[in-house]
Amino acid sequence: MQNSAQDYLQQMLDMVRQSGHVAIKYLNKSAPAFKKDFSVITKADKEISKLCRGALSKTLKDPAHLLLDEEDPHMASYLDQRRLEKTSFLWALDPIDGTRLYANRMPLFGISLGLLRELKPWLGVVYFPILKELFYCDGQDAYFVQNAFGSNQKRIKIRPIQEKLSGKSLFFCNDTFYNKFAWRDKDFHIMINACAVVNLCWPAIGRGVGCFLKCSLWDFAGSWPIMRKAGLDLRSMKTGQVMDQVHADLFNRTSKPWELKEYQLISSQKHYSQIKSKIFEIPTRNIYS
């Protein structure tokens, strides 16, 4: 018999809770190293990946389920539309999002786990162990939990926020933003956190008005259904088209498999045009000339 949304959600919550313990355990002895693409990997990344893969081992015996794990060396082989269309449930795990921050013992890192159904965002869980903050979507509603997994935890339902853009508003960008873009900051300002799940989850509760990124599926899969319940969507910077499901053609296949091809602007429909007007592409420069 197929599990219910609540069954899957409880499993996901258990996984991120245990993963949080692992992240805290290795925070001061993370043994950071570099991957081939020069991104950082730590002992916690490896241990959390192993933990979650073990927790899902029985589920993954069903060919209807597929796990996309940032630390899986075979992940590129899954980027095939015909295979994806045969996958009813696509799990996407980022063991430590904000790994560079984690490796420097900073608290802004999270554990992200998303479950897509028929390639559309469905369930999502994002946990910030040091902050003791949890965001999750149960398929119907999304919630923000303070003092998560504690006896005094406080759960708040996430709803669309009707905030007017002003001088106090913050818009989040990734750490490579200024390599290609500039920002007209007359009305409101940008902030760079170097952590995708911070950029995606915080605006869902009014900490910022949106974000700009080009990342991999595991970076945003957990946050995706959560932010949609807050009225925020992934929109193409080029066309403004909303991304509402996964398709292989949206992602790079070679240098960085599963990274989005296009930059995305995450915001409410109301704010999209105003925020986009603040971003402009700068001419490519040869830094050696």
Q: What is each PLM-predicted segment?
A:
Residues 1-14, 21, 201-289:
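Oxyanion/phosphate-interacting regions
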Residues 1-96, 284-289:
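N-terminal subdomain of lithium-sensitive/metallo-dependent phosphomonoesterases centered on the IMPase/IPPase/PAP
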Residues 19, 23, 45, 56, ...:
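Residue-level signal for inorganic ion chemistry
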Residues 62, 184-187, 229:
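Short, well-ordered coil/turn elements that cap or connect secondary structure elements
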Residues 67, 124, 191, 210-211:
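Hydrophobic residues within beta-strands of alpha/beta enzymes
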Residues 68, 74-141, 148:
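Active-site-adjacent structural elements in enzyme catalytic cores
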Residues 113-201, 250-289:
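Acidic beta-strand-loop-alpha-helix segment within the catalytic core
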